[in-house]
């Protein structure tokens, strides 16, 4: 089997993990205590779900996941929550004091005390796998644990499991809503450190998700639970092809092959449709063409940026539910003709398509309507550089005055790391800019 191990780091990672595992359990008919009643066995013994769950002798299904946080309160909620029997107690690893929004604490002082137990647990999980495919790491950019500890973990995973792919699901600091003043510092330090270790990073911007919840689901004041349930649908769409048998299945390495043209340009933009409340869904058709079209609306993106200002390098459409290739081809053909989608000229307009016949599942009592079909689009576009530019600008404003830097230096970091990280980000922006330049322009320059 091609197993995946999920690692959930820090408060954001753990809470995303809660939502995701809740959804996986519903999708596979696994009860909160890990049992799978025989009448619920889907499709008469489709065992693809073993990529994410391992089965014990007693017939219990245990997620292949590790939850880590440097302080216990968030993980304690799992220990006392409805899914407490699902996880092995040693899969929930907590420290005593938190990283206090400080990258240096997560990466150096406090992180290094907890990294070995975490790696031991990951080693035990990987020993249970017959053919480990890779890791999915969930975290935020802005928090201390999410930024600092994740980058430490990614470095160590690269050493221990060099050839395995590592995908990240990262919560990008929202442009308007901020949970910490030092988010730009943490984000840039973690991006710099994990850039060479991560194979593919799906970014999710809280503000974009807030807006989707407000606009499409009519939730006036979305809570993190609302946000995480929406995020979990996206994660589920991306991983569905690993967990179910499908017509056109996509595995982890296939994502990278199709979405990442250059090692550093590995930040695809995710878009999901239809995000719709039950009241509205009843009155709408939501055909393949409609949901495919919706993916090209900036309003449905997980990161605030405008793909109309950028160019696409690759595009991957993952359908699930009642979808046939004929409809998909028609929808894509329509988009190619009428949408102003600009691809870079060195990449012919390729759309990679995955189809999975398992319809999307919704959490009972959740906000999303039960629909027959859904689509998740992953596109690698140069527009995401806008997100980096915003972050870099905020970093510059603070760093020019060396504001808050003493907290980092006090935990054993050197000031040089800041400027080094910032230079790396400048290089990343430049990389994005160069990828978007038409190749025939380069040839003219060479002749002069």
From Swiss-Prot:
The modification Phosphotyrosine is found at residue 432. A motif (MREC motif) lies at residues 1-4. Some glutamate residues at the C-terminus are polyglutamylated, resulting in polyglutamate chains on the gamma-carboxyl group. Polyglutamylation plays a key role in microtubule severing by spastin (SPAST). SPAST preferentially recognizes and acts on microtubules decorated with short polyglutamate tails: severing activity by SPAST increases as the number of glutamates per tubulin rises from one to eight, but decreases beyond this glutamylation threshold. Glutamylation is also involved in cilia motility. Some glutamate residues at the C-terminus are monoglycylated but not polyglycylated due to the absence of functional TTLL10 in human. Monoglycylation is mainly limited to tubulin incorporated into cilia and flagella axonemes, which is required for their stability and maintenance. Flagella glycylation controls sperm motility. Both polyglutamylation and monoglycylation can coexist on the same protein on adjacent residues, and lowering glycylation levels increases polyglutamylation, and reciprocally. One of its GO terms (molecular function) is protein kinase binding. Its main location: cytoplasm. It is an enzyme of class 3 (hydrolase). Mg(2+) binds at residue 71. Disulfide bonds: none annotated. One of its GO terms (cellular component) is extracellular region. Tubulin is the major constituent of microtubules, a cylinder consisting of laterally associated linear protofilaments composed of alpha- and beta-tubulin heterodimers. Microtubules grow by the addition of GTP-tubulin dimers to the microtubule end, where a stabilizing cap forms. Below the cap, tubulin dimers are in GDP-bound state, owing to GTPase activity of alpha-tubulin. This is Tubulin alpha-4A chain. It comes from Homo sapiens. The gene is TUBA4A.
């Amino acid at each position: 089997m091609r197993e995946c191990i999920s690692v959930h780091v820090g408060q954001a990672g753990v809470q995303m993990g809660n939502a995701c595992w809740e959804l996986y359990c519903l999708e596979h008919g696994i009860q909160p205590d890990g049992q799978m009643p025989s009448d619920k066995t889907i499709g008469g013994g489709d065992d693809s779900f073993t990529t994410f769950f391992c089965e014990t002798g007693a017939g219990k299904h245990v997620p292949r996941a590790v939850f880590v946080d440097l302080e216990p309160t968030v993980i304690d909620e799992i220990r006392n929550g409805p899914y407490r029997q699902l996880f092995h107690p040693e899969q929930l690893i907590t420290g005593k004091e938190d990283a206090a929004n400080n990258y240096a604490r997560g990466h150096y002082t406090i992180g290094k005390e907890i990294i070995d137990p975490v790696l031991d647990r990951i080693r035990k999980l990987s020993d249970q796998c017959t053919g480990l495919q890779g890791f999915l790491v969930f975290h935020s950019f802005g928090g201390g644990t999410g930024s600092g500890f994740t980058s430490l973990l990614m470095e160590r995973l690269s050493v221990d499991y060099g050839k395995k792919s590592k995908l990240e699901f990262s919560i990008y600091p929202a442009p308007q809503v901020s949970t910490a003043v030092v988010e730009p510092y943490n984000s840039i330090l973690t991006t710099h450190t994990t850039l060479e270790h991560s194979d593919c990073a799906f970014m999710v911007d809280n503000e974009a998700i807030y807006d989707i919840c407000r606009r499409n689901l009519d939730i006036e004041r979305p809570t993190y639970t609302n946000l995480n349930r929406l995020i979990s649908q996206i994660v589920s769409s991306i991983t569905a092809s690993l967990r179910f048998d499908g017509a056109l299945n996509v595995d982890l390495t296939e994502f990278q092959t199709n979405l990442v043209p250059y090692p550093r340009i590995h930040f695809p933009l995710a878009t999901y449709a239809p995000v719709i409340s039950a009241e509205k869904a009843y009155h709408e058709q939501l055909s393949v063409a409609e949901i495919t079209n919706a993916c090209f609306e900036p309003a449905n993106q997980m990161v605030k940026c405008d793909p109309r200002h950028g160019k696409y390098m690759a595009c991957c459409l993952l359908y699930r539910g009642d979808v046939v290739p004929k409809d998909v081809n028609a929808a894509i053909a329509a988009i190619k003709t009428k949408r102003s989608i600009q691809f870079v000229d060195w990449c012919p307009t390729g759309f990679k398509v995955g189809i999975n016949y398992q319809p999307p599942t919704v959490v009972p009592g959740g906000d999303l309507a039960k629909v027959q079909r859904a689509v998740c689009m992953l596109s690698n576009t140069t527009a995401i550089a806008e997100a980096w530019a915003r972050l870099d600008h905020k970093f510059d404003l603070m760093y020019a005055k060396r504001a808050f830097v003493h907290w980092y230096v006090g935990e054993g970091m050197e000031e040089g790391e800041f400027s080094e990280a910032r230079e790396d980000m400048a290089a990343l922006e430049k990389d994005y800019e160069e990828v978007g330049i038409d190749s025939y322009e380069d040839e003219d320059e060479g002749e002069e």
